């Protein structure tokens, strides 16, 4: 079964992404900041601008992703607040090997759930990033770059939720 799952592109991508990240928590937090936080900050403003352009130019077409630019603007703000909380509070505490991280980690997981909901809204507005047959270059670029952004954000969330956070969450041992 494992061999079969590893043959699937998505399963292979997930395994590869988490296998290639540092396992040491301090190194992992620096990796997340340098790789994911920097990339999100670089990518999102361009995506907002491109979405606004596509919406304005193609506002008379039925497939136009109406409201996408606004969704992305909201995401810029939400992600910036989330990343700042990690960079200023959670990650420094992790680097100090602080205890009692359950509360900030729970807050970060809740933010991750909110980000997943935002991704679903984006997919709904874009019909799962399905381009119309006559899509222009800007529209095509928007969906291509948006797909890459979503993959990066999902990887970012997965690495924090599945690799980083479990190292600091208290384990509840049940007597059986």
Predicted segments with their positions:
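Small-residue-biased structural context
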Residues: 1-176
């Amino acid at each position: 079964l494992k061999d079969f799952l590893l043959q699937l592109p998505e399963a292979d991508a997930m395994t590869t992404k988490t296998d290639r990240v540092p396992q040491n928590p301090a190194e992992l937090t620096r990796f997340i900041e340098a790789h994911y936080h920097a990339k999100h900050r670089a990518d999102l403003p361009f995506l907002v601008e491109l979405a606004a352009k596509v919406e304005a130019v193609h506002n008379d077409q039925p497939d136009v992703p109406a409201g996408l630019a606004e969704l992305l603007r909201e995401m810029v703000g939400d992600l910036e607040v989330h990343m700042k909380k990690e960079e200023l509070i959670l990650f420094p505490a992790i680097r100090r090997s602080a205890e009692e991280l359950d509360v900030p980690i729970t807050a970060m997981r809740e933010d991750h759930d909110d980000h997943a909901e935002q991704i679903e809204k984006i997919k709904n507005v874009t019909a799962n990033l399905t381009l119309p047959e006559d899509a222009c270059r800007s529209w095509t670029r928007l969906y291509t770059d948006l797909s890459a952004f979503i993959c990066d954000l999902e990887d970012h969330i997965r690495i924090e939720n599945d690799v980083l956070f479990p190292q600091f969450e208290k384990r509840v041992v049940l007597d059986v």
